[in-house]
């Protein structure tokens, strides 16, 4: 998001590590509101643009940002109850959805503008007649670029806190790992962008088995590297990434272990097929997810906030 805002000439403010959170969500998700570790040093290390500032609660209220984003169910309580009463006269309010939450998790009663990263949010915005943009995140195509075809048998997975957040899907992949001895599964649950890019570069593809749709970074980044993504057909149904998951190009769909084994063996054992899919994958995704086009749409969305 910082790169998209930078392209539009906007500054992004994020709560600093000394921001004292007052309003937490209800159990069982009340252990998290947002990342509370941001410092100036961390921003310089993690973010490539110069348009990001970490600020305290007092600074946010003093600056009065043009737009205040709720970025998830977990932090809507802090934003709406602690900040918005003091900013409602000067700022616009929007919700950036990056996980397909349940219907009542969204503050329909209060927020009119929605930046949707998942298909469920799009459908719900249509139902509640809200203003929305089905937005694709800015992808760093320079960092996640196609360098060369790869051989070998490494298959990567890049789902944060996989075993804790999605235990059933994690167990499914672990079972595949035990059944498919010809593959070297690399399950990365805490990797940095640099570590993710390195693993993708070394791998032949990615496996992404998850019932909940997120922002979509890992899937698109893998495709950008020329690493097709194995997707569980049933779990992928109705997800927004189906718009760029092209069978035998950017994605390989499977419904059970046998189908996964057949398709993964073909990818590993047939060099001509593997190299064709990897190269075409990296080309196709750049056509389907275009940073400049998405940023232009984001600019229009921000200019026309209700």
Question: Where are the language model's segments positioned?
Answer:
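Extended catalytic core of nucleotide-activated donor transferases of GT-like folds
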Residues: 17, 24-123
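Donor nucleotide-sugar binding/catalytic pocket of nucleotide-sugar-dependent glycosyltransferases
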Residues: 112-145
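Conserved catalytic-core segment of nucleotide-activated headgroup transferases in glycan assembly
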Residues: 137-193
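Short alpha-helical segment that forms part of, or immediately flanks, the ligand-binding pocket
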Residues: 197, 220-224, 242-243
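Acidic donor-binding loop of glycosyltransferase active sites
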Residues: 198-214, 227
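Short hydrophobic beta-strand element within catalytic cores of glycosyltransferases
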Residues: 228-237
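C-terminal "capping" alpha-helix adjacent to the active site of nucleotide-linked donor transferases
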Residues: 252, 256-273
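A charged, aromatic-enriched C-terminal amphipathic alpha-helix characteristic of glycosyltransferases
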Residues: 269-303
């Amino acid at each position: 998001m910082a790169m998209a805002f930078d392209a539009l000439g906007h500054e992004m403010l994020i709560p600093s590590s000394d921001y004292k959170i007052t309003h937490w969500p209800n159990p069982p998700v009340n252990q998290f509101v947002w990342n509370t570790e941001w410092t100036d040093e961390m921003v310089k290390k993690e973010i490539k643009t110069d348009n990001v500032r970490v600020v305290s609660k007092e600074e946010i209220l003093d600056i009065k940002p043009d737009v205040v984003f709720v970025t998830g169910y977990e932090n809507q309580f802090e934003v709406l109850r602690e900040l918005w009463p003091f900013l409602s006269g000067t700022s616009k309010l929007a919700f950036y959805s990056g996980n397909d939450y349940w219907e009542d998790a969204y503050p329909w009663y209060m927020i009119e503008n929605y930046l949707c990263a998942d298909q469920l949010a799009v459908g719900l915005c249509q139902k509640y007649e809200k203003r929305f943009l089905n937005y694709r995140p800015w992808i760093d195509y320079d960092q996640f670029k196609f360098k060369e075809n790869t051989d070998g048998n490494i298959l990567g997975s890049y789902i944060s806190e996989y075993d804790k957040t999605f235990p059933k899907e994690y167990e499914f992949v672990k079972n595949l790992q035990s059944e498919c001895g010809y593959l070297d599964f690399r399950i990365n649950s805490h990797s940095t962008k640099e570590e993710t890019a390195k693993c993708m570069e070394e791998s032949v593809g990615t496996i992404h088995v998850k019932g909940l749709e997120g922002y979509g970074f890992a899937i698109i980044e893998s495709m950008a590297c020329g690493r097709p993504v194995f997707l569980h057909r049933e779990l992928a149904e109705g997800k927004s990434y189906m718009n760029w998951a092209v069978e035998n190009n950017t994605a390989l769909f499977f419904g059970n272990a046998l189908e996964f084994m057949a398709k993964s063996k073909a990818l590993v054992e047939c060099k001509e097929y593997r190299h064709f899919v990897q190269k075409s994958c990296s080309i196709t995704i750049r056509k389907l997810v275009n940073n400049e086009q998405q940023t232009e749409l984001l600019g229009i969305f921000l200019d026309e906030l209700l």
